[in-house]
């Protein structure tokens, strides 16, 4: 058997020759700019960071001075005195989307705030007024008093994001000051519990997952792409310690855009389109029962008589697979796709029935008062 080590000798000689020739080849071209020498996010940060703000919210709450005030035993037998006003402070981040002072942040950052102060990256500060807030989406829009010609971020098309894309998270974690962290898009179409304090436990959101470090104080801050555009609003993390474990979630920019558009139009509440249907994901067992080649999509279990899906010809047992070309594999995804289109929009919905496939246009109408987008009727 021929020894393998002998074949290394001519290879080493060839490598030595290449090494001697390399400097001469390298001198033939001078790098055009610093980006060709070393990877740096500095140009992205310079473009995006001025539009990311710190938000200081103050609430006046009623509290009793006694340490036993919240104990039901003591409060039953003893007079623990009157309540006194106490100040609660909250810290978060926000993103300027319009030069005249339109800022988007999380609902839980400004919920029940009596006073809001917004500080820009250049240390200018403004009083803020909430013009639209939604507990379920955990979004709020603030107007800065007397603001003009402010730096603003453009919205990215969050549907164009891909797992593995580089992203930056910008915010004010723990109040230490504006901080930038980097990571990638770890997952898309991630469903999980959504909403600010008091939101229904059953409320499911649709998020972009990232491993960029996100900590308390980053809430409402920016997740930006390498073009310096807003890809999402950082909203929550999964953590046992309260600090970053590399699992953060952002509300996609396409949903943020629909929300801000309604705020700028003067809406007093965020209006969602109403599907008037009850659906469930199609898993492997259900796919076999329905005669489908693979799991995926959502099956319609029931329709309201006035549902826009019923008007478009859908029936119980139909399987919705795509909305505007995007896969729909659960109620949260369907909810998201319809919400992004908004009331008055038209959804192109692909579906299966008895082995046949078709596409139908569904004209979306506003949800009845008190109705969730994927409920059969108001309050159901």
Identify the function of each model-found stretch.
Residues 1-5:
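N-terminal secretory signal peptides that target proteins for export/translocation
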Residues 10-19:
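Bacterial N-terminal signal peptides
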Residues 21-23:
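N-terminal signal peptide c-region/cleavage motif recognized by signal peptidases
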Residues 26-296, 301-306, 310-312, 331-345, ...:
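Serine-dependent protease modules
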Residues 317:
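Conserved catalytic motifs of ABC-family nucleotide-binding domains
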Residues 324:
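ABC transporter nucleotide-binding domain catalytic core, centered on the Walker B motif
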Residues 360-362:
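Edge beta-strands of extracellular beta-sandwich domains
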């Amino acid at each position: 058997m021929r020894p393998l080590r002998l074949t290394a000798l001519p290879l080493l000689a060839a490598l030595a020759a290449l090494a001697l020739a390399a400097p001469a080849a390298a001198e033939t071209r001078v790098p055009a700019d610093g980006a060709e020498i070393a990877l740096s996010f500095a140009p992205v940060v310079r473009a995006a960071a001025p539009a990311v703000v710190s938000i200081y919210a103050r609430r006046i709450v009623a509290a009793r001075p006694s340490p036993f005030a919240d104990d039901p035993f003591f409060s039953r037998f003893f007079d623990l005195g009157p309540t006194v006003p106490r100040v609660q402070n909250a810290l978060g981040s926000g993103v300027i989307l319009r030069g005249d002072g339109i800022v988007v942040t999380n609902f839980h950052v400004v919920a029940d705030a009596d006073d809001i102060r917004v500080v820009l990256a250049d240390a200018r500060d403004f009083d803020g007024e909430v013009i639209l807030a939604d507990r379920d989406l955990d979004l709020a829009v603030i107007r800065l008093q007397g603001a003009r010609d402010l730096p603003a971020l453009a919205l990215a098309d969050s549907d164009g994001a891909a797992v593995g894309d580089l992203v930056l998270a910008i915010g004010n974690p723990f109040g230490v000051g504006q901080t930038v962290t980097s990571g990638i898009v770890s997952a898309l179409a991630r469903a999980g519990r959504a909403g600010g304090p008091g939101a229904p436990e059953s409320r499911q959101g649709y998020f972009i997952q990232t491993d960029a470090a996100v900590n308390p104080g980053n809430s409402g801050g920016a997740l930006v792409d390498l073009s310096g555009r807003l890809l999402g609003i950082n909203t929550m993390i999964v953590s046992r310690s309260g600090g970053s474990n590399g699992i953060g979630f952002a509300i996609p920019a396409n949903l943020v855009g629909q929300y801000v558009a309604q705020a700028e139009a003067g809406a007093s509440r965020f209006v969602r389109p109403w599907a008037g249907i009850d659906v469930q994901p199609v898993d492997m067992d259900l796919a076999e029962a329905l005669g489908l080649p693979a799991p995926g999509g959502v099956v319609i279990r029931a329709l309201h008589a006035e549902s826009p899906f019923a008007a478009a010809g859908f029936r119980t047992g139909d399987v919705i697979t795509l909305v505007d070309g995007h896969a729909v594999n659960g109620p949260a995804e369907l909810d998201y796709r319809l919400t992004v289109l908004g009331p008055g929009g038209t959804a192109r919905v692909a579906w299966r029935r008895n082995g046949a496939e078709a596409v139908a246009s569904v004209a979306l109408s506003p949800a009845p008062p008190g109705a969730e987008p994927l409920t059969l009727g108001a309050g159901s």
